[in-house]
């Protein structure tokens, strides 16, 4: 049975996307992903995402809507469009680097496999 993971698709006012590079101590080291994590038992997906972003990035978000859900290997990744409600994050407990990336440059990053379906939906709308 796949492990459910939630992720936040966050854009800044210039339209750049928040991308996070996995630390070399994590599975899929040095791959890029949208920030998020695993829900706790009985926790709503949206609540889990708010909690994970606060824990990992010390940032506050509002979850707006589900964007994509796909199962890749052992991961059931549920991506939500989110909005920052405070300052932009600058550090992460789970990532070695944070970067605000323009849409045109997203495909240049080396992405973790579970994030690829959501990335494709961003780059090729209506697919």
Language-model features: where?
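Conserved Nudix-box catalytic region and its N-terminal flanking loop in Nudix hydrolases
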Residues: 16-51, 55
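Conserved N-terminal beta-strand and adjoining loop/helix that marks the start
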Residues: 1-17
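Active-site-adjacent beta-strand/loop module that shapes the phosphate/pyrophosphate-binding cleft
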Residues: 60, 68-90, 99-103, 122
């Amino acid at each position: 049975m796949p492990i459910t993971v939630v992720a936040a698709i966050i854009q800044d006012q210039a339209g750049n996307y928040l991308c996070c590079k996995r630390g070399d101590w994590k599975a899929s080291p040095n791959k890029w992903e949208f920030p998020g994590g695993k829900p706790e038992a009985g926790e709503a997906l949206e609540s889990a995402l708010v909690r994970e972003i606060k824990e990992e990035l010390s940032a506050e978000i509002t979850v707006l809507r589900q964007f994509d859900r796909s199962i890749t290997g052992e991961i059931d990744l549920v991506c939500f469009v989110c909005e920052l409600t405070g300052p932009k994050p600058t550090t992460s407990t789970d990532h070695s680097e944070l970067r605000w990336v323009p849409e045109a440059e997203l495909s240049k990053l080396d992405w973790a496999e579970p994030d690829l379906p959501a990335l494709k939906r961003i780059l090729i709308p209506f697919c």
